[in-house]
Amino acid sequence: MGRIARGSKMSSLIVSLLVVLVSLNLASETTAKYTYSSPPPPEHSPPPPEHSPPPPYHYESPPPPKHSPPPPTPVYKYKSPPPPMHSPPPPYHFESPPPPKHSPPPPTPVYKYKSPPPPKHSPAPVHHYKYKSPPPPTPVYKYKSPPPPKHSPAPEHHYKYKSPPPPKHFPAPEHHYKYKYKSPPPPTPVYKYKSPPPPTPVYKYKSPPPPKHSPAPVHHYKYKSPPPPTPVYKSPPPPEHSPPPPTPVYKYKSPPPPMHSPPPPTPVYKYKSPPPPMHSPPPPVYSPPPPKHHYSYTSPPPPHHY
């Protein structure tokens, strides 16, 4: 009985294990089937290709950008420039941006350049206004006013010429000449000839002659003095004296001193000084340089890094 019980237990265990295994297998199979069932959707690749056409459709959409709506807007902008007749505002706007870039200094120059343009624009409107109507009136009025002044002198001249005509008559000229010599004309010309011209030329002619005579006496004096030049010929003998030669002799005497031994001593002293450097001490002095070089190499790197 015990064996049977044991056998039944074992069989139940085996059955349970088998059931578990079968269930697991089924589950794995179901899962495998599911996994296999899922691949089929990927196999429905045709739909994606069908969906792929939409991209071409999207590419077909670009034509909308091809539509001219946007260009019309810029065209309209170019149509607006007619108001550009008020061009000063745009330049003013374009000139104002630079100041922001150069915060303090540029503003002043920009303002300077801003002020000139207005005057330039002002003449244009004035010209326009002139061409509209003012031009004719202005020149006409100008030409109307000048003639009067021109005529004004003419009348005066006419008045002058009006009085001469009477003198043109035979008796009139005689009276005119007589009258001129009597008082009006004579005084002016007589006064002119009496003092201004005569004194000046007389004084001029009086002063020049003396200078002309002065050179003659000078020449005369020169001709009187020529004899002294003969003493000049007498003076040459002094140069003949031997004093000059002594100077060159002294010059030749001076070179010898440099040739004396004194100069050599100086070079000897120079040669005496070099030997000390030849002593062994200098090498030790040269030994320090390595550390200096090392120190120099240590210091430069930081600047390079910076």
UniProtKB/Swiss-Prot annotation:
GO cellular component term, pick one: extracellular region
GTP-binding as UniProt keyword: no
GO biological process terms held by the UniProt record: plant-type cell wall organization
InterPro entries membership: Extensin_dom
Compositionally biased residues, Pro residues: 38-122, 133-152, 183-214, 225-290
Region listing for Disordered, in residue ranges: 33-306
Post-translation changes: Hydroxylated on proline residues in the S-P-P-P-P repeat.
Keyword tags: Cell wall, Cell wall biogenesis/degradation, Glycoprotein, Hydroxylation, Repeat, Secreted, Signal
A Pfam family of this chain: Extensin_2
Entry's Gene Ontology molecular function annotations: structural constituent of cell wall
Signal peptide boundaries: 1-32
Subcellular location: Secreted, Primary cell wall
Function: Structural component in primary cell wall.
Protein name per Swiss-Prot or TrEMBL: Extensin
